[in-house]
């Protein structure tokens, strides 16, 4: 092998090794973020489960019949879908699974003769649905790395007012639940 070609190959090998090191560092950072997100989700799960149980008990007892968020809107012909994805990739099949679940729910709503309203959280869902030519009624970005309560309140306000006024027949969330 000529000296010039050998030098080129050595440079390429060094470049690949450098890229491998950078990729490994990115994997470690992503793994750390996943662990932190899992810890936050796990700490909120008991609270979420208990709140859900209390609401179900209130509904069964008939104590919540008049609450505007628990009554049916039979005249409404629109189902809202809140689709929660990440702002960036590097999260395995998370975004794809959430978007597929949302698309199945949208198809089911259309089969029932309902219109749909898309509320998306994260750039990935927004880009996907706009690429598909679907109207996105509300989009929230920059919340997925470090979500806080105020972010959830902002998203809920966008949906709540429409449900309370009778514009929406239902509201569904599309997300994945982590199982270890």
PLM-predicted stretches and their roles:
Residues 1-180:
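Conserved loop-to-helix interface motifs that mediate assembly, gating, or partner/ligand docking
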């Amino acid at each position: 092998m000529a000296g010039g070609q050998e030098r080129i190959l050595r440079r390429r090998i060094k470049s690949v090794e450098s890229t491998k090191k950078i990729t490994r560092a990115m994997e470690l950072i992503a793994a750390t973020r996943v662990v932190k997100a899992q810890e936050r989700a796990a700490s909120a799960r008991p609270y979420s489960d208990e709140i859900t149980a209390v609401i179900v008990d209130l509904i069964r007892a008939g104590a919540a019949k008049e609450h505007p968020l628990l009554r049916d809107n039979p005249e409404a012909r629109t189902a809202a879908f809140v689709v929660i994805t990440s702002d960036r990739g590097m999260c395995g099949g998370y975004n794809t699974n959430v978007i597929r679940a949302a698309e199945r729910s949208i198809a089911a709503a259309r089969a029932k003769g309902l219109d749909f309203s898309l509320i998306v959280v994260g750039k990935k869902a927004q880009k996907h649905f706009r690429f598909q030519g679907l109207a996105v009624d509300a989009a929230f970005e920059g919340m997925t790395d470090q979500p806080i309560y105020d972010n959830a309140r902002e998203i809920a306000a966008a949906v709540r007012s429409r449900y309370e006024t009778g514009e929406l027949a239902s509201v569904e969330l599309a997300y994945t639940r982590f199982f270890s």
